[in-house]
């Protein structure tokens, strides 16, 4: 994500490297290039890199001009769903695949997660917790948060005719909080699988117990405040380890 600012850093700090760049690619674009030999990208990918102007429905010329980027650095744009190339002979041999298989889809991790959960329409939300926690909601209008507390990307089914934007709220401390709970709720030792089974014993909503997982430093969603992690709603004679897990 945020490829534009990373590219600007390279341009300023490693100009010799910047001058050698032919095309910029997200990881998915690079993998597709290795599979097909074709360099291309998608609107969804460009929006994750902050290169897309939703009002103009084009590469963000104002941003390219601001950073002094040449438009030629942007790869050809292909539909998120549609033929983006075919597996070439080299990749087929390396991977044991049949040459000529079409590559027809690519997207980032959170749009992919939303796709897997059938989240496509305004008001629908996908949530996941891993290294970070993410709440990803689909919006049907072009707008943004002027405080940059959330990120807005083109969702996998976004088109010029049908606005479908993924609004991404990232909670950075979720993964490490899971590790903290593992170490401190059951210091005698417990696996993550056992934690999941223990948590399944609690009712939905954990009888009012909630954990604010902000123990990993400042959070952009809170305007860079450091609030710390806290457990709320716990009642000593009611709640058990299952609720906290």
Tell me what each language-model feature is.
Residues 243-245:
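Positively charged, low-complexity/disordered segments
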Residues 67-79:
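A conserved helix-loop-beta module that forms one wall/lid of the active-site cleft
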Residues 80-87:
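Gly/charged, well-structured mid-domain segments that form the phosphate/adenylate-handling core
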Residues 1-39, 45, 50-61, 65-68, ...:
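Active-site core segments that coordinate phosphate-bearing ligands/cofactors
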């Amino acid at each position: 994500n945020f490829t534009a600012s990373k590219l600007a850093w390279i341009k300023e700090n490693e100009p010799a490297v910047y001058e050698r760049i032919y095309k910029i690619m997200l990881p998915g674009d690079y993998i597709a290039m290795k599979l097909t030999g074709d360099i291309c990208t998608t609107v969804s990918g460009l929006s994750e890199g902050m290169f897309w102007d939703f009002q103009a429905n084009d590469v963000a010329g104002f941003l390219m001009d601001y950073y002094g980027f040449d438009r030629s650095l942007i790869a050809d744009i292909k539909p998120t769903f549609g033929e983006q190339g075919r597996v070439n002979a080299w990749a087929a041999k390396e991977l044991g695949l049949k040459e000529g298989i079409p590559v027809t889809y690519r997207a980032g991790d959170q749009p992919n997660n939303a796709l897997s959960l059938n989240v496509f329409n305004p008001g629908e939300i996908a949530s996941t917790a891993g290294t970070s926690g993410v709440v990803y909601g689909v919006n049907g209008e072009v707008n943004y948060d002027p405080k940059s507390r959330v990120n807005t990307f083109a969702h996998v089914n976004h088109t010029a005719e049908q606005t479908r934007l993924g609004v991404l709220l990232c909670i950075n401390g979720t993964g490490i909080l899971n590790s903290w709970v593992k170490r401190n709720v059951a210091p005698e030792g417990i696996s993550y699988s056992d934690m999941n089974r223990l948590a399944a014993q609690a009712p939905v909503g954990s009888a009012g117990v909630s954990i604010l997982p902000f123990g990993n430093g400042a959070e952009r969603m809170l305007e860079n405040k450091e609030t710390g992690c806290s457990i709320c709603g716990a009642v000593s004679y009611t709640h058990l380890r299952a609720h906290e897990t």
